[in-house]
Amino acid sequence: AVTALTAQNTTGVRGILACSPEFLGQQVDAVFEDIRPDAVKIGMVPSKALVQMTADRLRFHRAERIVLDPVMVATSGSRLMETETAAVLEKELMPLALVVTPNIPEAEILAGMKIREKSEMEAAAVKIWEKFGCAVLVKGGHSVSDADDFLFDGRKGEWFCGKRIDNPNTHGTGCTLSSAIASNLAKGYSLSESVRRSKDYLSLALAEMLNLGAGSGPMDHGFALTGTFAE
């Protein structure tokens, strides 16, 4: 289901056109009433009304294995969601999620604390779980923990360590990771195994060093496909 259309390329976003809440609800109903998804990934939801509609329809259809990428703050620190919309997301969507995947700035907001080192990533994950009752994958950045992420599921914590790949084309890495986690959950893997497999996939996609566009381009999602174009 599409929450908003964007006009963008590798150099930046030129415009965002949000769907109406009613049309979003129709999209969700159309999917669940025909080919029920085994997992759901939620990304950018740009308004309070759209957050509320998303939560209402997912509750109605008793959606399972929900992966929520909050998309509240960019890794640069820029706010991507209004404070009022974020409050509705915390109240309505967070409790429905199996796992939420905040970056460091988002985890700081959700946990109400600063994160400067790996022990604080662990503490923030526990605080978020205590507030919302969902598993938490705090995504590290090289300013805190290189490419290491911390998962807390309410019972135990687990580090997923990765090697930082010096690739400037990282557009969509957070969205890719959360989508890959949902895909692996849909295939029947545990949350821990889904995170591990998804991080491996993301690392391989980045390692291909795809170079498209004049700005920060995407990674190579189709790296496993081989062959050449016809001349």
Residue ranges and their predicted role:
Residues 1-75, 79, 227:
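Conserved N-terminal subdomain of the carbohydrate kinase-like
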Residues 157-171:
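Short pre-catalytic strand/loop immediately N-terminal to key active-site residues, enriched for Gly-Thr
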Residues 114-121, 186-196:
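Short, charged, surface-exposed loops that flank catalytic or proteolytic processing sites
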Residues 83-157:
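Conserved phosphate/ATP/ADP-binding segment of small-molecule kinases
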Residues 192-231:
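Charged C-terminal helix
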Residues 108-109, 167-191:
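Short, small-residue alpha-helix embedded
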Residues 12-18, 78-83, 112-116, 166:
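Short glycine-enriched, charge-decorated loop/helix-capping segments at active-site entrances
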